[in-house]
Swiss-Prot record:
Catalytic activity: tRNA(Cys) + L-cysteine + ATP = L-cysteinyl-tRNA(Cys) + AMP + diphosphate
Coarse class of the protein's main subcellular location: cytoplasm
Encoding gene per record: cysS
PANTHER family per UniProt: CYSTEINE--TRNA LIGASE, CYTOPLASMIC, CYSTEINYL-TRNA SYNTHETASE
Name by which UniProt lists this protein: Cysteine--tRNA ligase
GO molecular-function terms, A-Z: ATP binding; cysteine-tRNA ligase activity; zinc ion binding
Lineage: Bacteria, Pseudomonadati, Spirochaetota, Spirochaetia, Spirochaetales
Source organism (scientific name): Treponema pallidum (strain Nichols)
């Protein structure tokens, strides 16, 4: 069986075949760094990481590009609302680039804790402004863009297949798109309400924090042009896989595709993969006619703008490990909405600990028969398999591989490993070799944790991964941000910062001379 993926473009599962044999060009939508990543955001990056790891496992060479949006992302995908970075900078009393750098670092701290490997190339939008300007100039030259009211717009009518992408892919977001279109319909400079801005001049925001010189006046890029320009800069005119959330299909990704294919005149992305939302359990008290009341639970998409979200530090404060959350995510199919609750996470933690305990027993048995269990990195795992019965190990992973080749079915892949660990007919050393290879895909550190639990004589599943201590500069930035939040009476934000620092082992004490901190 070869890899099959569900392609949003065709709305069906297809055999995967990259443009270039053996080499996959992968682009993943990265974060807009105006706040801490919430758990729903992190689901996206665990999935991107899983796709990349799976492709490596299947023998592909992967060039993985991820953007960092630090300019031009408005509150609505359809050119309306405030700039998210500017609003965050104003709230914190810092420059846009300072805020972006802070939250960029926070993003990569969280992804590292989750075992997410860094992309081959990480590109900041603010570093690629000239590439965006050159891209817009090409669109204008080809008749796909026009200048009006000081801005440059993409002319949707010039690209006949614009509506064909995502037209029936996600009906649930239709209402949101229609609302966004309605908000910008009054823009009299647009020839069509669907047209979108490629370059804003000061006609949009008179005192925008970040502006650059351009042929159309000093201004800044729209959000959609950034991803197109960065993808084509680092991956070339063709991309094999583009990954993003279902909420971006109908506007952002549709616009990206239109921009790129208007330039090249040829298909741009071969396979579009879209992951579903992580839902958050909300509870509220309902008052009944008889004056009684009850607690009503519901699930809703995590949203920073609505204040409905949890961060990774929120989980750590409750005693969960990042690996518990990664295991929870891998237990769900990426194209299915996943409901997060504390009970669900407890169940995932129990399942992961049980699995690690079983693996620890297998590792112990392998030690007894071979004397040691060798390296645990992807390279050592591959070396070990090559040295000892590689074909047998590959055979043990037949079901695991088949699950991943079926549109990255991680729930089935986990089930296959559970079955392997319980199979007493498999020699322990061979089982460990197979598990080492499998974990280069799952990224759970199962063998490392099982081995550490045996060495440290602590319960398997309870060992914590090593992580670097936070720098004094980073701590100082957060302490100052918390002080500003308290001054502006943004107490929820101040509490969030305290919790984040506590999760990193930093204790705060507020005194009449200011806030002091110490490591605990």
């Amino acid at each position: 069986m070869a890899l099959r993926v569900y392609n949003t473009l065709t709305r069906q599962q297809e055999h995967f075949q990259p443009w270039e044999h053996g080499h996959v060009r992968l682009y993943g939508c990265g974060p807009t760094v105006y706040n801490y990543p919430h758990l729903g955001n992190l689901r996206a990056y665990v999935f991107q990481d899983t796709v990349r790891r799976t492709l490596h496992f299947l023998g592909y060479r992967v060039t993985y590009v991820m953007n960092i949006t630090d300019v031009g992302h408005l509150e609505s995908d359809a050119d309306s609302g405030e700039d998210k970075l500017v609003r965050s900078a104003q709230a914190h009393g810092h420059s846009v680039l300072q805020v972006a750098a802070h939250y960029r670092a926070a993003f990569f701290r969280d992804t590292a804790l989750l075992g997410i490997e860094e992309p081959s190339i990480v590109c900041n939008a603010s570093d690629c402004i000239q590439d965006m300007i050159a891209f817009i100039e090409q669109l204008l030259a080809r008749g796909h863009a026009y200048c009006a009211g000081g801005n440059v717009y993409f002319d949707v009518r010039s690209f006949p297949s614009y509506e064909s992408f995502g037209s029936a892919a996600v009906e649930d977001v239709q209402e949101g798109e229609d609302a966004a279109r309605a908000r910008v319909a009054h823009d009299t400079h647009k020839r069509d309400a669907r047209d979108f801005v490629l370059w804003f001049t000061r006609s949009k925001f008179v005192r925008h924090a970040l502006t650059w010189d351009s042929p159309w006046g000093r201004g800044y890029p729209g959000w959609h042009i950034g991803c197109s320009a960065m993808s084509m800069k680092f991956l070339g005119p063709r991309c094999d896989i583009h990954i993003g959330g279902v909420d971006h299909i109908r506007v952002h990704h549709r616009n990206e595709r239109a921009q790129c294919e208007a330039i090249t005149g040829a298909p741009w992305v071969r396979y579009w993969l879209h992951h579903e939302f992580l839902l958050m359990q909300l509870q509220k008290r309902a008052v009944h006619a008889d004056m009684g009341s009850s607690v009503v639970s519901s699930f809703s998409k995590m949203s920073k703008s609505c204040g409905q979200f949890l961060t990774l530090s929120s989980l750590q404060e409750r005693g969960f490990q990042p690996a518990d959350f990664r295991f929870f995510l891998l237990s769900g199919q990426y194209r299915t909405q996943l409901a997060f609750s504390w009970d669900a996470l407890k169940t995932a933690r129990a399942a992961r600990r049980s699995f690690v305990r079983r693996v620890a027993r297998v590792v112990d048995a392998a030690r007894a028969t071979t004397g040691s269990v060798r390296g645990t990195s992807a390279e050592c795992a591959a070396e070990r398999v090559c040295e000892s019965r590689a074909s047998e190990s590959e055979l043990l992973l037949t079901d695991f591989r088949a699950a991943l080749e079926d549109d990255f079915s991680t729930p089935r892949a986990l089930s296959a490993l559970q079955k392997l660990v319980r199979d007493t007919s498999v020699p322990p050393s061979l089982c460990v070799s197979a598990l080492q290879v499998a974990d280069t895909v799952l990224g759970l550190g199962i063998i490392q944790e099982a081995t550490a639990s045996l060495s440290a004589q602590v319960p398997a599943g309870d060992t914590l991964p090593q992580r670097p201590l936070p720098s004094e500069e980073w701590i100082g930035q957060l302490v100052r941000a918390r002080a500003h939040a308290r001054q502006t009476r943004d107490f929820p934000r101040a509490d969030e910062i305290r919790r984040q620092l506590k999760a990193e082992g930093i204790e705060l004490e507020d005194t009449h001379l200011g806030t002091i901190w110490k490591r605990v």
